[in-house]
């Protein structure tokens, strides 16, 4: 603990007591914020792990299925099938505030189907159709995964900042204020006793 360099006066004592009350209120609010951020963070981490497992599993299975589908078609024909995107997608990224943390919210809009696309269910095979359908169904999961991972990163940063502020108040500011208040109270008591002794001597 470090005693603050202030004059031991009653006015200073009152000021320090107000500062201590404010620091203690701030400490409680920050601890509550940290705990709630941690609760949400843990929930998001669980969702992130589950989503990642699902997406990776789909991608691994789909790559195997694609290898099989590709082996059943001419490689040049496969390249032509995917040479032009079959649809155009707009990605929208909005912002949401969660406990003073600005996090992304993503959604997409299919703006048009590309009529010039080489891919069609007539020119492909059923195996390739399955691969194509699975990849289309994965887009929403991939967007949510990106959203959750970014949110986790931002929340982890905020948790660390809040933790440092809580520790600063708990282990430095509040003890220093308390120590200084105690010191001033002792000094004022000493001054009162000395003053009382002088009065008694005068009498």
Swiss-Prot record:
The keyword Translocase does not apply. It holds the Pfam family ATP-synt_D. One of its GO terms (biological process) is proton motive force-driven plasma membrane ATP synthesis. Gene3D superfamilies: 1.10.287.3240. One of its GO terms (molecular function) is proton-transporting ATP synthase activity, rotational mechanism. Keywords: ATP synthesis, Hydrogen ion transport, Ion transport, Transport. InterPro entries: V_ATPase_D (IPR002699). The keyword Membrane does not apply. It comes from the Bacteria. Produces ATP from ADP in the presence of a proton gradient across the membrane. PANTHER family: V-TYPE ATP SYNTHASE SUBUNIT D. Belongs to the V-ATPase D subunit family. NCBIfam families: PRK00373.1-5 (NF001546), V_ATPase_subD (TIGR00309). This is V-type ATP synthase subunit D. It comes from Streptococcus pneumoniae (strain Hungary19A-6). The gene is atpD.
């Amino acid at each position: 603990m470090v005693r603050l360099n202030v004059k031991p006066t009653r006015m200073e004592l009152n000021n320090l007591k107000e500062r201590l009350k404010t620091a203690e209120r701030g400490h409680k609010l920050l601890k509550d914020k940290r705990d709630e951020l941690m609760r949400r963070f843990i929930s998001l981490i669980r969702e992130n792990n589950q989503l990642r497992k699902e997406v990776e599993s789909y991608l691994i299975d789909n790559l195997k299925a694609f290898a099989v589908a590709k082996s059943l078609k001419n490689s040049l024909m496969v390249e032509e099938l995917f040479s032009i995107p079959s649809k155009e997608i707009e990605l929208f990224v909005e912002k949401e505030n969660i406990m003073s943390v600005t996090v992304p919210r993503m959604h997409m809009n299919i703006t048009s189907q590309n009529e010039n696309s080489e891919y069609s269910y007539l020119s492909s095979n059923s195996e390739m159709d399955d691969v194509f359908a699975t990849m289309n169904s994965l887009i929403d999961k991939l967007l949510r995964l990106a959203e959750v991972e970014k949110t986790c990163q931002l929340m982890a940063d905020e948790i660390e900042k809040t933790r440092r502020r809580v520790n600063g108040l708990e282990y430095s500011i509040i003890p220093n204020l308390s120590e200084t208040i105690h010191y001033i109270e002792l000094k004022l008591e000493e001054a009162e006793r000395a003053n009382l002794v002088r009065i008694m001597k005068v009498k």
